[in-house]
């Protein structure tokens, strides 16, 4: 209900499921430019699991998202963060059908560490990832992956990199059509095929940019009072507003 459907990305999703079914190095990390749909991949996988449209090894799996900011919040003393994260890991170890999703996974490198020698999040996760006790899905941009995540060799070699590239215009149009009904219901207006096609072609690369191109028009239309036939409509412009 709350998650938008994943349209396309069948090759990347199939690759993700193959990695998760391994005995070792069974942790995929989605790497791509901002806006290509890395988080949507994890949401799409969750929906496939819910529909049981996955291999037997992944049936009844539960995906948990790690709120790293919440774990760090209010940690005044050395060891507070370590204790919280170890508590999360211990709880996940009790659930053999659990997968941990960490958005912006490069942020765990150095998270919680202090000059006094306390361990950061990545060092706490490494042992359980190496043993296969916990499976993890991460996401990061190309720049952050290269500059931060990949430099921690002991951590990055536990993961299988899956590149999420920008979709072609034809696939972006299909993505927009798949999400059209939800945006129409929200705004109370109709998106025409030509409007979606124009948004995809003008945004060129990213579905999120195409959505951003169509949303302001709908928002403006739905927030203004309806124009009656006997009332002249004011047309705003850049010069006068």
Where in the sequence are the language-model features?
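Loop/turn-to-beta-strand initiation segments
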Residues: 26, 62, 93-100, 131-137, ...
């Amino acid at each position: 209900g709350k998650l938008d459907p994943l349209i396309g990305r069948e090759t990347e999703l199939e690759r993700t499921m193959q990695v998760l079914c391994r005995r070792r190095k069974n942790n995929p990390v989605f790497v791509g430019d901002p806006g290509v749909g890395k988080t949507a991949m994890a949401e799409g996988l969750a929906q496939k699991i819910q529909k049981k449209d996955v291999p037997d090894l992944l049936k009844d799996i539960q995906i948990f998202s790690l709120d790293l900011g919440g774990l760090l919040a209010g940690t005044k003393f050395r060891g507070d963060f370590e204790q919280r994260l170890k508590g999360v890991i211990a709880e996940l170890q009790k659930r053999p059908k659990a997968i941990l999703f960490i958005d912006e996974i490069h942020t765990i490198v150095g998270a919680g560490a202090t000059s006094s020698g306390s361990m950061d999040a990545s060092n706490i996760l490494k042992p359980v990832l190496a043993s296969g006790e916990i499976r993890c899905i991460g996401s990061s941009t190309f720049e952050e992956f290269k500059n931060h995540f990949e430099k921690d060799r002991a951590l990055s070699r536990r993961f299988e990199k899956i590149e999420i590239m920008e979709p072609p215009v034809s696939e972006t149009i299909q993505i927009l059509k798949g999400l059209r009904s939800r945006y129409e219901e929200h705004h109370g207006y109709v998106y025409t095929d030509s409007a979606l096609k124009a948004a995809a072609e003008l945004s060129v690369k990213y579905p999120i940019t195409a959505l951003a191109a169509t949303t302001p028009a709908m928002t403006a239309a739905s927030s203004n009072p309806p124009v009656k036939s006997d009332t002249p409509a004011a047309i705003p412009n850049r010069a006068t507003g």
